[in-house]
Amino acid sequence: MAAIRKKLVIVGDGACGKTCLLIVFSKDQFPEVYVPTVFENYIADIEVDSKQVELALWDTAGQEDYDRLRPLSYPDTDVILMCFSVDSPDSLENIPEKWTPEVKHFCPNVPIILVGNKKDLRNDEHTRRELIKMKQEPVKPEEGRDMANRISAFGYLECSAKTKDGVREVFEMATRAALQVRKRKKRSGCLLL
């Protein structure tokens, strides 16, 4: 039986951990060096609920310089991973300010999984000290859950690509969300207007 094909697009602020999450899931290795993404695609096979799914993983650039290029990733998307970083309250603030309006404009009716990346840094002393200097603290799990409700996300999960904690669960939830959509509506993929 041929695998079902689904397209996943990951969005979020620059340096919030999008590429590491995709690479750890698809290649099982953590990249130690940060290289800003322009456009990358990966393919990963995943089995959920006895279904074989070939997941096309579309990485995007979070930096503002790419705001006009990013929409080219959106057509025919089945699920969105919308990411912020637990060590960056500002990246969580950009979820309703920037990412939700953009995604809902180009991908109406496409399920969104809100993902808190870098959860290993929540209790990291160096991270906490740096945030205190800016009168901030790491994002709490309940703040992530509240945001997921606020943007009507399909679900909320936290993970650490570095420790691999929660990575598989993110993609299992995303795959389930992508599979569910098709039952309701035959063709509700992204539109480019």
Curated annotation (Swiss-Prot):
Keyword Isomerase included in the entry's annotation: no
Keyword field: Cell membrane, Glycoprotein, GTP-binding, Lipoprotein, Membrane, Methylation, Nucleotide-binding, Prenylation
Localization: Cell membrane
InterPro entries: P-loop_NTPase (IPR027417), Small_GTP-bd (IPR005225), Small_GTPase (IPR001806), Small_GTPase_Rho (IPR003578)
Superkingdom classification of source: Eukaryota
One annotated GO biological process: skeletal muscle satellite cell migration
Post-translational modification remark: (Microbial infection) Glycosylated at Tyr-34 by Yersinia ruckeri toxin Afp18. Mono-O-GlcNAcylation by Afp18 inhibits RhoA activation by guanine nucleotide exchange factors and blocks RhoA signaling.
Binding positions (GTP): 12-19, 30-37, 59-63, 117-120, 160-162
Chief location bin: membrane
Pfam families: Ras
Modified residues (Cysteine methyl ester): C190
Entries under PROSITE patterns matching the protein: RHO (PS51420)
CDD domains membership: RhoA_like (cd01870)
Residues that carry a glycan: Y34
Gene Ontology MF annotations: GTP binding; GTPase activity; protein kinase binding
GO cellular component, one term: cytosol
Function of the protein: Regulates a signal transduction pathway linking plasma membrane receptors to the assembly of focal adhesions and actin stress fibers.
Name the record gives this protein: Rho-related GTP-binding protein RhoA-D
Naturally occurring in which organism (per UniProt): Danio rerio (Zebrafish)
